[in-house]
């Protein structure tokens, strides 16, 4: 079930995130009032709906598509970010891992995947996280003794955090159902 969030921690965390991106010239986008079926693109099997102004809409799961819309509308921008509420009607929510309603901070920026990774590392350093252990999905599978066609589960993610602290997973294979807009690597096809 969804837990109450400590207002002091929320204020401090969102303040740090806002400061980081505003200092880089990003603009904040209010996405929560935009009605769209695209706001429910994370997992179609846990979409909740509501009736508003005589039409049925999905409760938003992400502001990603609106951030991408702004980025495409203003390609010379530094980037965009939003703070929104995500609604995920998880049928098998894992306590401590899944909240069915939670605040989410997202950003989009122009550039390559290497630019994105550099930004993520810089953000983690700014927020005070320690060293980050980075491995490809295949390397993490090998670490846990999983075959290449076996998807990692929540238990593996928890073990990563316990053993390594902060981690980064790259190069997600097709078996993990990556987002439809992610680049496809033809290396292993």
Where are these regions (language model features)?
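Generic amphipathic alpha-helical segments used as scaffolds and interaction surfaces in large
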Residues: 4-8, 12, 57, 108-114, ...
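Short beta-strand segments
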Residues: 60, 113, 170
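Metal-assisted phosphate- and nucleotidyl-transfer catalytic regions
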Residues: 117-186
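Class II aminoacyl-tRNA synthetase-like tRNA-binding/catalytic domains
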Residues: 1-110
């Amino acid at each position: 079930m969804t837990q109450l969030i400590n207002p002091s921690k929320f204020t401090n965390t969102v303040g740090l995130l806002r400061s980081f991106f505003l200092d880089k010239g990003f603009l904040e986008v209010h996405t929560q009032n935009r009605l769209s079926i695209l706001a429910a693109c994370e997992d179609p099997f846990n979409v909740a709906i509501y009736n508003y102004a005589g039409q049925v809409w999905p409760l938003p799961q992400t502001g990603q598509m609106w951030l991408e819309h702004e980025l495409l509308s203003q390609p010379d921008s530094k980037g965009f970010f939003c703070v929104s509420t995500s609604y995920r009607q998880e049928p098998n929510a894992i306590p401590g891992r899944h909240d069915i309603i939670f605040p989410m901070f997202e950003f989009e920026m122009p550039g390559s995947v290497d630019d994105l990774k550099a930004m993520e590392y810089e953000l983690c350093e700014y927020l005070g996280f320690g060293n980050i252990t980075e491995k490809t999905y295949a390397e993490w599978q090998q670490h846990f003794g999983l075959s290449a066609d076996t998807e990692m589960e929540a238990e593996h993610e928890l073990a990563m955090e316990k053993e390594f602290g902060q981690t980064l997973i790259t190069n997600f294979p097709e078996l993990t159902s990556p987002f439809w807009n992610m680049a496809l690597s033809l290396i292993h096809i």
